[in-house]
Amino acid sequence: METKTKLHVGLLFGGNSSEHDVSKRSAHNIYDAMDKDRYNVSLFLLTRDGFVLSDAASRRVFDGEDEATVAAEEQAKVDASNPLAPIWNLSQAKDIDVFFPIIHGNLGEDGTIQGLFRLLKKPFVGSGVLASAVSFDKDMTKQVLTAHGIRNTKYVVLTPDNRADFDYATIQSRLGDNVFIKPANQGSSVGIHKASNVQEYLDGVADAFRYDYKVLVEQTIDGPQEVEISILGNEQPQASKLGAIRVPESDVFYDYNNKFVDASGVTFEVPVKLSDELTQEITQMGLQTYAALGLKGMARIDYLVSKDGVPYVGEVNTLPGFTNISLYPQLWQATGINYADLIDRLIELALSEFHYQDELAYDFIPLDDHSAASTYKPKA
């Protein structure tokens, strides 16, 4: 009987964002859900200061050892003068068939790690460099959505150069009395503030500029319902059932504290009961957003639904969480795809996209050279 070769998966997690520990919990769940008869899994923890630990060292942290201690031991083994020292352990993983990154936020969702995988010529789960970078930047995301006629909230972009031109009175005239202030390139609700007066506006803008040199000021939606959808696929993606997040009435929005410090007052409705018409509209908007941004593999799309039932696309998450309370896998579970099957499908999509992109030519081919062109086969 022929023995089937296992697929070697590199599970990369951690990172330098505020979601470092969340990423570790996501990685634990993904690892536990993987069929070990089908996959060999190597673990790679990216420390907070940007050093990739070896599989053996990552497993020690996985098993509960202190990350800083293990990282110090690992870094001592590598020539610090080598500019590639931080990713040395990845360079030793020559037989990896596919990478599964689950680094949330900075470095993981902004196109950085995807560019590294491209240089390594390795398949990877999730969207490519461009789609990741555009989706991580809230301003660029909104520009794409607006160009495609996909409803999103009105906003103004502040930079160090134009910041002085947008005092609170100017913002009021454009967006109303109540606004949200957000760093353009941040996740986890870090640096986000709601402002309803001059001082709140000044304080919120000052804090947001600590995290990015581009800050969004957005109109608020009165009493919104926060709804989410999971998308899975490449050229022909499918959408999950919808879910909703309920935060305590005393809280202004689903903020960093709700997510990571004290989530005791937060509840999730999966699936959420909405009208058929609204459900269809949100689902269609999700698929349109996915296509407009050129997303691949997976994404979770967040919406704000106004009191009168009008949905607005909020944010797009290209590497959503896989923790016990994360909605991305929960929504698929409610739709009929269990955790293990979801992981299998994501890996299959990564391999499919890699081979699809590998058919493209990157060097000049003369028009009379039909040898290369004849090998092209349109993707089904």
Curated annotation (Swiss-Prot):
Mg(2+) 2 binds at E315, N317. ATP binds at residues 172-227. Binds 2 magnesium or manganese ions per subunit. GO terms for biological process: cell wall organization; peptidoglycan biosynthetic process; regulation of cell shape. Belongs to the D-alanine--D-alanine ligase family. It catalyses: 2 D-alanine + ATP = D-alanyl-D-alanine + ADP + phosphate + H(+). SUPFAM superfamilies: Glutathione synthetase ATP-binding domain-like, PreATP-grasp domain. PANTHER family: D-ALANINE--D-ALANINE LIGASE, D-ALANINE--D-ALANINE LIGASE A. InterPro entries: ATP-grasp, ATP_grasp_subdomain_1, D-Ala_lig_Van_CS, D_ala_D_ala, Dala_Dala_lig_C, Dala_Dala_lig_N, PreATP-grasp_dom_sf. Disulfide bonds: none annotated. It is an enzyme of class 6 (ligase). Keywords: ATP-binding, Cell shape, Cell wall biogenesis/degradation, Cytoplasm, Ligase, Magnesium, Manganese, Metal-binding, Nucleotide-binding, Peptidoglycan synthesis. HAMAP family: Dala_Dala_lig. PROSITE patterns: ATP_GRASP (PS50975), DALA_DALA_LIGASE_1 (PS00843), DALA_DALA_LIGASE_2 (PS00844). Residues 142-348 form the ATP-grasp domain. This is D-alanine--D-alanine ligase. Its main location: cytoplasm. GO terms for molecular function: ATP binding; D-alanine-D-alanine ligase activity; metal ion binding. GO terms for cellular component: cytosol. It is found in: Cytoplasm. Mg(2+) 1 binds at D302, E315. Pathway: Cell wall biogenesis; peptidoglycan biosynthesis. Its cofactor is Mg(2+); Mn(2+). Its EC number is 6.3.2.4. Cell wall formation.
